[in-house]
Every structure is written in C-alpha cells, then in structure tokens.
Amino acid sequence: LSLGTIKKLLQILAQGLKAICNHRDLIAKGCQA
C-alpha cells in the first residue's frame, strides 16, 4: 500500500465514524468528548 492509499482509507474510516456518531446521540456525545 502507498501512503496515499493509506491516507484515503483513514479518511473513509473517519467519515464512517462521523456518520455513526451523527446517527446515535449518545455515541455522538462520546465522539465529541
């Protein structure tokens, strides 16, 4: 894997975590902390 590919994968993971946080209020509070 190249660094660019790893960075893209990390971005996708971060976006996925944000989406989960946005859909669950309790988890969203935990993610913001």
From Swiss-Prot:
Superkingdom field: Eukaryota
Q: Where in the cell is it found?
A: Secreted
Q: Which GO terms describe its cellular component?
A: extracellular region
Q: Does the keyword Thylakoid apply?
A: no
Q: Which UniProt keywords apply?
A: Disulfide bond, Secreted
The entry's note on the tissues where this protein occurs is: Expressed by the venom gland.
Concerning its family, UniProt says: Belongs to the myrmexin family.
Further facts? There are 6 heterodimeric myrmexins which consist of a small subunit (SS1 or SS2 or SS3) disulfide-linked to a larger, quite structurally unrelated subunit (LS1 or LS2). MALDI experiments give a mass of 6998 Da for U1-PSDTX-Pt1b heterodimer (SS1+LS1).
Subunit architecture: Heterodimer composed of subunit LS1 and subunit SS1 (U1-PSDTX-Pt1b), heterodimer composed of subunit LS1 and SS2 (U1-PSDTX-Pt1b), and heterodimer composed of subunit LS1 and SS3; disulfide-linked.
Q: What does this protein do?
A: This heterodimer may have anti-inflammatory properties, since the myrmexin complex (composed of 6 SS-LS heterodimers) inhibits carrageenin-induced edema in a dose-dependent manner (after subcutaneous injection into rats).
User: What's the protein here called?
Assistant: U1-pseudomyrmecitoxin-Pt1 subunit LS1
- Please tell me the species this chain comes from: Pseudomyrmex triplarinus
